[in-house]
Curated annotation (Swiss-Prot):
The keyword Metal-binding does not apply. The lineage of its organism: Viruses, Riboviria, Pararnavirae, Artverviricota, Revtraviricetes. Residues 487-500 have a biased composition (Basic and acidic residues). Keywords: Host cytoplasm, Translation regulation. The keyword Cytoplasm does not apply. It comes from Cauliflower mosaic virus (strain S-Japan). GO terms for cellular component: host cell cytoplasm. Enhances the ribosomal termination-reinitiation event leading to the translation of major open reading frames on the polycistronic viral RNAs. GO terms for biological process: regulation of translation. Its main location: host cell. This is Transactivator/viroplasmin protein. The inclusion bodies are the site of viral DNA synthesis, virion assembly and accumulation in the infected cell. Belongs to the caulimoviridae viroplasmin family. Residues 487-522 are annotated as: Disordered.
Length: 522
């Protein structure tokens, strides 16, 4: 019995120690730091020892309950199913901060409120937070040459400034100091102006004409504002013209020199037809649509061979483009066949005030066979500004010839006719009266001495000779006073070049008021 009493006493002591350990663990969790828990354990060790000694001092054998007699040997331990081990029969434990009850151990978080996260108030914690922040690294890009040369801090702006521009050079640097040093070294070597720094928000990269830089126009985003309707399967068509349609004399001279010096090595989508004084562009599939538009405005195109999606002519005037689409869908059975646009055009004329005459075009649409491009040769370009009028007169004569040849064709379908443009195609049937009247009206409007925007006696003389061969008559009241000058000029020309235009420098008169002309063709 004495051994049993000792064992029971040791059991109670161990239970007290266990309760103390649990209470201290709970207190350590409440403080939120294991270090503080260790310090609390160290500080409360005398309390624990005092509680143990007091329990031993007050213990007497009479307080021990006798264990009921067991029915079998080895069953002297307490029955685990007895209510004495339930939490309600266990004693409360006093700690430094609060009275911990055994029932608390069965509650969520052991009856201890979850401590709130405190703000970092130490330099160590602040340093730990700042060390986790990653500052983005900014690269700098130097565009050395081209229309948008400068120093950029954004790759998107740099790409827009260099994309599609031939011969442009650019490089990336890690710091603005390195970028500035490289830019200054380049400008000093090239003896050009100092490159400016262009931040992201101040970059203004607007598309320029092909004559200045080959930059494609930006794609236009579609904005759908209607609610409750189905979005169309395709985006809206781009604007008809994405740049200024009026061509300047400098742009014309640039395109003229480009056609004369083109040798066919740099671009497989272009070949040229070279004559004595002028070279005309021929555009194949995948040609640059903006260059097609500018060459069209300059009157320097002979033929266009567009793709099935007609992307090469998407910047031409809308009515011309629509006429080509109607021909493709309504006039040929196999819409997948390749087509061509054969263009006969005048060239622009300028005065001191600016553009005087825009080109006029006669366009033939047809089904294209196998393309056999002519060999492009680099021709010598010696044109001067004073020679542009003579070149315009020559193009005007060829334009009139092409327009009058329509009278010999009996099977023509007029696809579109405008003030300065006629689009036609061949037809399997004879020309109907409506189309014939449209052709005659267009001829009467444009075939005159004022074809180029001013009265040109050389054009009148050419028209008169051409109409007389057809058995008709042509009269111009502007030429009545200058018949002798025209005859003398034509006589001088016969000794040199019978087919070329007469000299025009001394006989060109600017038209102030539109003139009336008559044309009779038998």
């Amino acid at each position: 019995m004495e051994n049993i009493e000792k064992l029971l006493m040791q059991e109670k002591i161990l239970m007290l120690e266990l309760d103390l350990v649990r209470a201290k663990i709970s207190l350590a969790r409440a403080n939120g730091s294991s270090q503080q828990g260790d310090l609390s354990l160290h500080r409360e060790t005398p309390v624990k020892e005092e509680a143990v000694h007091s329990a031993l001092a007050t213990f007497t054998p009479t307080q021990v309950k006798a264990i009921p007699e067991q029915t079998a040997p080895g069953k002297e331990s307490t029955n685990p199913l007895m209510a004495s081990i339930l939490p309600k029969d266990m004693n409360s434990v006093q700690t430094e901060n609060r009275l911990v009850k055994p029932l608390d151990f069965l509650r969520p978080h052991q009856g201890i409120p979850i401590p709130q996260k405190s703000e970092p108030n130490s330099s160590v914690t602040l340093h730990r937070v700042e060390s986790g922040i990653q500052h983005p690294h900014t690269n700098y890009y130097v565009v050395y040459n081209g229309p948008h040369a400068g120093i950029y801090d954004d790759w998107g702006c740099t790409k827009a400034a260099t994309n599609g521009v031939p011969g442009v050079a650019h490089k990336k640097f890690a710091t603005i100091t390195e970028a500035r040093a490289a830019a200054d070294a380049y400008t000093t070597n090239q003896q050009t102006g100092r490159l400016n720094f262009i931040p992201k928000g101040e970059a203004q990269l607007k598309p320029k004409s092909f004559a200045k830089a080959l930059i494609s126009p930006p794609k236009q985003k579609a904005h759908w504002l209607t609610l409750g309707t189905k979005k169309p399967s395709s985006d809206p068509a781009p604007k008809e013209i994405s740049f200024d349609p009026e061509i300047t004399m400098d742009d014309f001279l640039y395109l003229y020199d480009l056609a004369r010096k083109f040798d066919g090595e740099d671009d497989g989508t272009i070949f040229t037809t070279d004559n004595e004084k002028i070279s005309l562009f021929n555009f194949r599939k995948n040609a640059n649509p903006q260059m097609v538009r500018e060459a069209y405005t300059a009157g320097l195109i002979k033929t266009i061979y567009p793709s099935n999606n007609l992307q090469e002519i998407k910047y031409l005037p809308k009515k011309v483009k629509d006429a080509v689409k109607r021909f493709r869908t309504n006039c040929i059975k196999n819409t997948e066949k390749d087509i061509f646009l054969k263009i006969r055009s005048t060239i622009p004329v300028w005065t001191i005030q600016g553009l005087l005459h825009k080109p006029r075009q006669v366009i033939e649409i047809g089904v294209s066979k196998k393309i056999v491009p002519t060999e492009s040769k680099a021709m010598e370009s010696k044109i001067q500004i004073e020679d542009l009028t003579e070149l315009a007169v020559k193009s005007g004569e060829q334009f009139i010839q092409s327009l009058l040849r329509l009278n010999d064709k009996k099977k023509i379908f007029v696809n579109m006719v405008e003030h300065d443009t006629l689009v036609y195609s061949k037809n399997i049937k004879d020309t109907v009266s409506e189309d014939q009247r449209a052709i005659e009206t267009f001829q009467q409007r444009v075939i005159s001495g004022n074809l180029l925007g001013f009265h040109c006696p050389a054009i009148c003389h050419f028209i008169m000779k051409t109409v007389e061969k057809e058995g008709g008559a042509y009269k111009c009241h502007h030429c009545e006073k200058g018949k002798a000058i025209v005859k003398d000029a034509s006589t001088d020309r016969g000794t040199t070049d019978k087919d070329g235009p007469p000299p025009t420098r001394s006989i060109v008169e600017k038209e102030d008021v539109p003139t009336t002309s008559s044309k009779q063709v038998d």
